[in-house]
Regions:
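Residues in the helix-turn-helix
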Residues: 90
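Single, function-defining residue in the core of a domain
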Residues: 1-70, 84, 93, 98, ...
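Active-site-adjacent helix/loop segment of glycosyltransferases
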Residues: 121
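Phosphate-interacting basic helix/loop segments used at nucleotide- and nucleic-acid interfaces
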Residues: 117-118
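Conserved mixed alpha/beta core segments that line enzyme active sites in large multi-domain catalysts
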Residues: 154-155
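Conserved beta-strand elements of the Class I
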Residues: 133-135
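Blade-loop segments of beta-propeller domains
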Residues: 75-80
Length: 306
């Protein structure tokens, strides 16, 4: 593992640059995230934009407690925001309010869109030029939490109750940035549970690189029916029927197949099967990009299939 050789001063400079970028993106008055009012109808003393921007700054500056967030917004102030006369408990209550999720999400979307504008000159627009965009979808179970709290000490090590859930996201391959991220409270939840929700973040006509956690014939048909291109690894023991061979030489194959050997469990659309070997490793992929001229398999493009 490579050691981090960045000096403390350089780290501080990087953090300041990031904070300046964030202030430019979300520090203006044109972004409103105050969608919820008090029961009395009055606006909260501490605007949601200030509170949740403060949370982001707290993470960037390495704060370790909610008390430091309260001090930031009520004592010190930051950016062009003045101090807000609120109690520490008021800040704690706001941070625990589930409605704050929408405000934080709005801030993250602003940062995401701002980053995309800056990354535009470096975007890999030559990747799969036939597609509107190129996106990868994947899910990952979060690491277990430490058993510091009394209630958690009673939970056996290895119990799924120690897992804080999982995240499932959409990654923009051309721009090399996350476009959407969802949290699932159940760590054992199947990724396919949120598959259709993820599609809302992906423009029609895009190429979707699907992880095996999303593998299912109905999912592939849904993508095709809704105007998406897709690529997926072929799951072991999946049956299929050969339709046409474009090319075959040893372990290398390119052709059309029906997923599902029998009509009762067959996918609605024919797909393209591509297989090849690199060293001793054999790869098998399926895609609805059925024209070999659109998505070729050679040394230059093999990264698509890996």
């Amino acid at each position: 593992m490579n050691k981090d050789t960045t000096t403390p001063q350089k780290k501080e400079n990087i953090a300041q640059d990031i904070e300046g970028f964030l202030q430019e993106l979300i520090g203006g008055n044109d972004l409103s995230v105050d969608k919820h009012r008090k029961p009395s109808g009055r606006k909260a003393i501490l605007p949601a934009l200030v509170l949740w921007s403060g949370v982001i700054i707290a993470v960037l500056r390495g704060f370790s407690s909610q008390l430091q967030i309260w001090r930031l917004v009520s004592w010190e102030g930051f950016w062009h925001y003045s101090q807000y006369p609120v109690t520490d408990q008021a800040v704690y209550n706001r941070l625990a309010d589930e409605r704050g999720q929408e405000a934080m999400q709005a801030l993250f979307y602003r940062v995401r869109d701002g980053l995309k504008e800056r990354l535009a000159p470096y975007a890999q627009q030559k990747l799969a030029t036939f597609a509107t965009g190129v996106y990868a979808i994947d899910g990952s179970t979060l690491d277990k939490v430490a058993r510091h709290l009394p209630k958690l000490r009673e939970v056996a090590n290895g119990d799924s109750k120690l897992l804080p859930g999982k995240i499932v996201g959409v990654f923009d391959v051309r721009y090399q940035q996350w476009r959407e991220m969802l949290h699932l409270a159940n760590p054992n939840q199947n990724d396919k549970f949120v598959a259709t929700r993820l599609l809302k973040a992906i423009p029609v006509g895009s190429l979707v690189l699907a992880d095996l956690g999303f593998f299912s014939f109905p999912w592939f048909d849904t993508l095709t029916d809704n105007g998406y291109w897709w690529i997926s690894r072929l799951r072991n023991k999946v049956t299929y029927e050969m339709i046409h061979t474009f090319y075959q030489n040893g372990d290398t194959f390119d052709g059309l197949i029906w997923l599902g050997k029998y009509r009762a469990d067959r996918a609605a659309h024919a797909v393209r099967l591509v297989t090849f070997s690199i060293g001793k490793v054999h790869f098998r992929y399926i895609t609805n990009v059925r024209n070999p001229l659109q998505l070729t398999v050679n040394n230059h493009h093999q990264r698509w299939w890996l």
